[in-house]
Amino acid sequence: MQNSTTEFLKPRQIDVNTFSATRAKVSMQPFERGFGHTLGNALRRILLSSMNGFAPTEVAIAGVLHEYSTVGGVQEDVVDILLNIKGIVFKLHGRSQVQLVLKKSGSGVVSAGDIELPHDVEILNPGHVICHLADNGQIEMEIKVEQGRGYQSVSGRQVVRDENRQIGAIQLDASFSPISRVSFEVEPARVEQRTDLDKLVLDIETDGSIDPEEAVRSAARILIDQMSIFADLQGTPVEEVEEKSPPIDPVLLHPVDDLELTVRSANCLKAEDIYYIGDLIQRTETELLKTPNLGRKSLNEIKEVLASKGLTLGSKLEAWPPVGLEKP
């Protein structure tokens, strides 16, 4: 049984200092020396890379075929409009994707709040500007919003080809992470006479689609889930797979006599222990020309006969000769 000198301390004091709906500091203590940096770095990396969120992944603007177009009566070009759409913070409830519609005309600002929303979709920054319209300007678009994790480029994301997809729909690189910024500090902590302990302080800022405190809980659950496999570490037995020899073309198992060569050529081959077609095709022209009494004329005869069967000299065969093959 472990005594007090070998048992690990666990954090007993957790404080949450909330600055706003999107920013909070979470402090935990005490940790054994070094564990503040170990866990702080792990949680920070998970928070930045592995949290689920929502982002626009596809936009179709009426009259626009590609991102380098312009829209009449709209101050911004399409590239700027798409960048502004990426800045909208969405939150979906009970669904993983949604198709949204935006229609507006007349002079003024087009903002995220102008997007038509179903009851289970929120926009957390409705004042976010998408574009500006002139007196005769109008804009109509569809925006596809999906749930995902981390950052996904268009090339790295599996895009399902939909025959009903609107022509001119523009795919977007998507940053799903709801974490805007996260940092951590490790401060000294003290328990009774021990002064070599750590206090971990996490400073988290989100886009508002997730509470900072909930983000820390989610990151901790991910870390525990990933590390739990090591708590019950067992080697996986490796099944021995019997190596099977590659199949051999039956033609190669035929004796060279089946090639109907001249008696002179056939005898020269047998003198070199070449009994099967499989033996023959592994020899090179140079090797055969070194065979006593086999000249260029006989070599050309052999090449022509092999070519008629789709075979050539100098071929490589694995597992030759096959088990059980005897001299005829």
Curated annotation (Swiss-Prot):
It comes from the Bacteria. GO terms for molecular function: DNA binding; DNA-directed RNA polymerase activity; protein dimerization activity. Residues 1-234 are annotated as: Alpha N-terminal domain (alpha-NTD). Residues 248-328 are annotated as: Alpha C-terminal domain (alpha-CTD). The keyword Iron does not apply. Keywords: DNA-directed RNA polymerase, Nucleotidyltransferase, Transcription, Transferase. InterPro entries: DNA-dir_RNA_pol_insert (IPR011262), DNA-dir_RNA_pol_RpoA/D/Rpb3 (IPR011263), DNA-dir_RpoA (IPR011773), RBP11-like (IPR036603), RNAP_asu_C (IPR011260), RNApol_insert_sf (IPR036643). It catalyses: RNA(n) + a ribonucleoside 5'-triphosphate = RNA(n+1) + diphosphate. One of its GO terms (cellular component) is cytoplasm. Gene3D superfamilies: 5' to 3' exonuclease, C-terminal subdomain, DNA-directed RNA polymerase, insert domain, RNA polymerase, RBP11-like subunit. DNA-dependent RNA polymerase catalyzes the transcription of DNA into RNA using the four ribonucleoside triphosphates as substrates. NCBIfam families: PRK05182.1-2 (NF003513), PRK05182.2-5 (NF003519), rpoA (TIGR02027). Belongs to the RNA polymerase alpha chain family. The N-terminal domain is essential for RNAP assembly and basal transcription, whereas the C-terminal domain is involved in interaction with transcriptional regulators and with upstream promoter elements. This is DNA-directed RNA polymerase subunit alpha. It comes from Neisseria gonorrhoeae (strain ATCC 700825 / FA 1090). The gene is rpoA.
